Regions:
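A short alpha-helical cap/connector motif
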Residues: 1-114, 120-144, 149-285
Length: 285
C-alpha cells in the first residue's frame, strides 16, 4: 500500500503536521475532521492522550496545535517510547487491549479531556480502549478512534458482527433509546455518550453525561388552528394502530387475540412497504 501526503495549506493542523521534526503518518482526510472536532480545546488546560506513539511525530503535532497549557500523554507497547519523556511528554507503556492496563492508567493520571486511539486498530483494541475511555473522559470531552477502515479488512478478522464499527452502531442505538416514545432503559454508554460522529476511517464520541437525559415531548403552547395532520391520512397502518389502541387497556382473551392479529398484519404491511424503498440501500455500498 502506497502512502501519499496531500498538503492543504489552508489547514493549520496540516501545516503543523508538516513542520514537526519526527515522523507521523496521518491520512489526508483526517486534518479537517480533527480541526472541526478539536479547535475548541486550543490554548486550554486540557489533558490529551494518544494511543500509539510510533516516532512521536503526532505528540509534537498535538503539543503545537493545542498550545503550552495542554498536558500530552502518549501510550505505546514499545518500551523505547520512554525516550520521549525527555521532551516533556508523559509516556506509559502497556497493552491497550488489557483491562488491567486501563484501570491502572486512569488511577494514575485521572480523568482526561481527549483520547485519540491510533494504536493497533484491531476490533478488540478499539473496543476495550473505548470502553474505558468513555468512563474516564470529562464531560465535554472527546474520544476519537482512527483508522477504522481496518474493520473491513480480512487480515483484521473482519467482517465481524463484533467489529468496532458495529460496536459504535450499537452505541447509536443506545443514544436513540433515550427517546421518550421508546420508553426503554438505556445502557451504560448511553448515559455518557451524547453523540457519535462518523467520518471516513474515523469515529468520534462526544462525552457529556449532563446532556444524556431522556427526551420528552414539549409544546410552546401557541395557538392551534386545528390543522389536520396529513402524514397518516388514509394510511391503513394508522387505522390499524388506532383500532388496536381501543383494546390497549383490555386484558380479555378476545382482546389479546385481536391485538395479536393486528400485530401480524402490521408486520406483513411493513414488509410489503419495505419492498418499495429497499432499492435505495444499494446506493449505500
Amino acid at each position: 500500500m502506497s502512502l501519499q501526503k496531500t498538503i492543504d495549506m489552508t489547514s493549520n493542523l496540516r501545516e503543523i503536521y508538516e513542520s514537526v521534526p519526527y515522523l507521523s503518518i496521518k491520512y489526508d482526510t483526517y486534518f479537517s475532521a480533527y480541526e472541526a472536532l478539536l479547535q475548541k480545546y486550543v490554548d486550554c488546560e486540557v489533558t490529551v492522550v494518544e494511543v500509539g506513539i510510533f516516532n512521536a511525530g503526532s505528540l509534537f503535532m498535538w503539543r503545537k496545535f493545542f498550545g503550552s497549557k495542554a498536558r500530552i500523554i502518549g501510550i505505546d507497547l514499545n518500551p523505547d517510547a520512554r525516550e520521549w519523556e525527555k521532551h516533556g511528554f508523559e509516556i506509559f507503556i502497556g497493552d491497550q487491549s488489557s483491562d488491567s492496563f486501563w484501570t491502572d492508567l486512569f488511577q494514575k493520571i485521572g480523568k482526561v479531556d481527549v483520547l485519540i486511539d491510533d494504536g493497533g486498530h484491531t476490533n478488540r483494541q478499539q473496543i476495550v480502549t473505548s470502553h474505558y475511555a468513555i468512563q474516564n473522559i470529562n464531560d465535554g470531552g472527546l474520544l476519537i478512534v482512527e483508522d477504522v477502515h481496518t474493520n473491513y479488512f480480512r487480515e483484521f478478522g473482519n467482517p465481524s458482527r463484533y467489529s468496532f464499527v458495529n460496536f459504535a452502531h450499537r452505541i447509536v442505538d443506545g443514544i436513540n433509546s433515550r427517546a421518550y416514545a421508546l420508553r426503554r432503559t438505556y445502557a451504560q454508554y448511553s448515559s455518557r455518550v451524547y453523540s457519535v460522529s462518523f467520518f471516513e476511517s474515523m469515529v468520534a464520541f462526544q462525552i457529556d453525561s449532563r446532556l444524556c437525559k431522556q427526551s420528552v415531548p414539549t409544546s410552546n403552547n401557541g395557538a392551534s388552528r386545528g390543522v389536520t395532520d396529513f402524514r397518516y391520512q388514509g394510511a391503513v397502518t394508522n387505522a390499524l394502530f388506532l383500532f388496536k389502541n381501543k383494546f390497549a387497556s383490555s386484558g380479555s382473551v378476545s382482546a389479546r387475540v385481536v391485538k395479536r392479529g393486528i400485530d401480524m398484519l402490521l408486520s406483513f404491511l411493513s414488509a410489503a412497504e419495505t419492498i418499495r424503498y429497499k432499492k435505495y440501500f444499494k446506493d449505500v455500498g
